[in-house]
Structure formats: structure tokens, C-alpha cells
Amino acid sequence: MRYKNIREGRFLSRPNRFIARVEIDGQEEICHVKNTGRCRELLVPGASVFLEKSDKKERKTAYDLIAVKKGNRLINMDSQIPNRVVEEWLRKGSLFGEGAYIRPETKYGNSRFDLYLEQGERKIFMEVKGVTLEEDGIARFPDAPTERGIKHIKELCQCIKEGYEAYIMFVIQMKDVKHFEPNKKTHEEFAKVLLEAEEAGVHVLAYDCFVKPDAILLGEPVEVKLI
């Protein structure tokens, strides 16, 4: 997945979840933040950020903030991109083989899962979660309590009972992490429900990403530690 019209800037502040103040070539700009999560460990004053300039003149903001540097690590923080990256990867035949039928945004029960797949007799639901939180080389999710995330996991368990396969894929939007684990400190219940889901047959996967200022590509599997 590639971006266009990338500019580097410097993060100044975040007045609310949706916008940030940045400096580009000495000029202050208001940009749209493509992640409504807290991201407090990423968006610190002075951090180098990468922005995509929009070609839509009617927009209120000219730029989208899509990536940030944390030390020497480049982290993509576009919360809309993990689904697209995984779908692109699956359509190349990864994980389930070539020729799979893939349908995004498919309703099941009271939820809408990110992907539904059919491969031969197999019927599969998949939920995708983007991960931007990294602490001491460990990738963690979530960075804030997520009742919606718990609901999705419980619905995946129901899928298993009804004969479907179920997957939850954590897309770590960076490279060079040691492993992935649920963020018990932030949301202990999410960690508990995720472990119970794996024990019930839900496949829990984590993959890192190759990240450049203008691109992101799904990388390699990362060890998942649930206990």
C-alpha cells in the first residue's frame, strides 16, 4: 500500500483526537490525524512526522498525519490502513492460498467483521486490529480500554460454535519488535477474553510491517504471548 505527496514535518500539539498542529518547512499547519487513539507515546512535541497532502481542495485540512518517528523506529499510525494491507496480502494467496473468495466488512450477528473468506469448504471470519503501541520492543494492544474489541472477540467465539473458522489478526504497524501481547495494564478484561477465545479455537495472529514514509506492507509473523 502506497501513499502519495508525502511531506515531512514536526509535531507541535494535538488540540483534540482528530487534528494536530504541525510545522512543515517553517510553516504551521493544522492536519487531520488518521488515528483517534491516544498515541501519547508517539505524538510528543518535536517528533518527526510524515504527512500526506490531500488533492481535495474542499477539505478543511490539507494534510493527513500518517506516520511518526519514535527514536530510530518509523511507525505508521493510520488506523484505516491495516484492513487494506491484510486484504491486499490475502488476495496474493497468503495464509489461505490463491483463489479464495474475500468480502470486506461482512455482518455477523450484532457485529461487522473486517473480512469474510471462503476457500473450498472453509468459511472464515477475520477481525483485524492495528497496533501502534510499542514499549521496550514489545507490541501491545489496546492502548485504551476497548469494549468494542471485547464484543468482536466474543462474536468470533460464537462463529466457532456455528462451524466457521475465526481469526483475529494484530497488524503491528512497525518493524523490529520482540513479540506481541495484550495490554493487561490498560485493559485486563480484553487480555482475559482474548486468551479464552484462543482456547475456544479462535486463531490469534500477529504480523509486523515494513514501513516507509510513503508505504506500508505486511511483513513477518510475530510471536504472540497471551499468558
Q: Which ranges hold each PLM region?
A:
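Conserved catalytic cores of phosphodiester-cleaving nucleases, focusing on short active-site segments
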Residues: G9, F113-D143, L156
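Flexible glycine-rich surface loops and low-complexity tracts that mediate binding to linear polymers
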Residues: P45-K56, D208
